[in-house]
Amino acid sequence: MKCLVEIHSYYKTQIEIAKRCDMVYDFAMPPLVLHSLFSGDPSALANWLQISPRNCVTVLDTHDGIGIVDVGPEGDKPGLLNAAQIDSLVEQIHQNSNGQSREATGAAASNLDLYQVNCTYYNALGANDQAYLIARAVQIFSPGIPQVYYAGLFAAENDMALLAKTNVGRDINRPYLDEQAVSESLEKPVVKALIALIRLRNSLAALVGEFSVTQQENILRLNWQSDQSAAQLTVDFASLVASVTYSENGIEHHVDISVDSLAQSVTA
């Protein structure tokens, strides 16, 4: 039996808890990836990946909202993001979702989710396919075991009908899907691309090796190195251009992170 701890708290508390259990959820990653994409500045994300627990399960979305407390300050102790950055992050989510997340968050809904924003991750990014694929690429190329929530796998949009029915803010990201809805979702180019990205990640032997992260201005690089292979995810957060390069048995490969490039590889 293994213990996987689910706790929303100050980031240093999370680090300490990780030393005392088998695994923890990385709840700091979702807001940090959003902040990087919104601002074009991945420095806070790079800093976190330098110190984050390696015995973690990474997420971008879950059955709950997008946590904010995990990157915020605690009293006079600074957080991974400052108050102004957090305010900007939350407002950008509300703007990208055309106000839908505002309707589902805090006093607007029956549950007072003051520490999280209720919204699908896809809508938090304004349903921007390229930004969404980059977010997932960062998640699955970071240390830990990546967990992809079912609504995230299908790039689901906010379920405003369910929210109106229940008035439970978190239900905005808890869609009921029948067989037809799943089949239709699997035909979406962004979903095909995401599945191809996951398959690529799972095929790379380097990802059981040593991890390092480098950042220069708007460029973030996630590097993996093992005895016989290497892999690197490079993301330009200013231009939203990303790629994976990897070598196995001395052969170099390059894959662009884009809907067209990845979606085509599903049937290749």
Spell out what each predicted region is.
Residues M1-A268:
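Active-site and adjacent substrate-binding regions of carbohydrate-active enzymes
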